[in-house]
Amino acid sequence: MPKCPKCGAEVKEPIKTWVLAPKGRKGVIIGLFRCPNGHYFRAKVGEAPPKKEAA
């Protein structure tokens, strides 16, 4: 569970997630979180599979 960098509160569920990956390489899944004190922050949620190139 990610912790808020400002207040240290643990947050369970992200508001939104997206894949951040360079071309042809393995990327990461980033999540946008909001702590109980109202601070927004981003954190790594998981690993993304490598993109498959079209032939």
Swiss-Prot record:
Q: What is its main location?
A: cytoplasm
Q: Which residues form the signal peptide?
A: none
Question: What Gene3D superfamilies is this protein classified in?
Answer: Chromatin protein Cren7
List, in alphabetical order, the Gene Ontology terms for molecular function in this entry.
Answer: double-stranded DNA binding
Pfam families recorded: Cren7
Q: Mind telling me which InterPro entries this protein's record contains?
A: Cren7_sf, dsDNA-bd_Cren7
Q: Does the keyword Repeat apply?
A: no
Identify the GO cellular component terms for this protein.
Answer: chromosome; cytoplasm
- Subcellular location, record wording: Chromosome; Cytoplasm
Query: What post-translational events are described?
Result: Methylated at multiple sites, to varying extents.
Keyword annotations for this protein?
Chromosome, Cytoplasm, DNA-binding, Methylation
UniProt key word ATP-binding: no
**Biological function:** A chromatin protein, binds double-stranded DNA without sequence specificity. Constrains negative DNA supercoils.
Q: Give the multimer and partner information.
A: Monomer.
Similarity-based family: Belongs to the Cren7 family.
Protein name, UniProt field: Chromatin protein Cren7
High-level lineage: Archaea, Thermoproteota, Thermoprotei, Desulfurococcales, Desulfurococcaceae
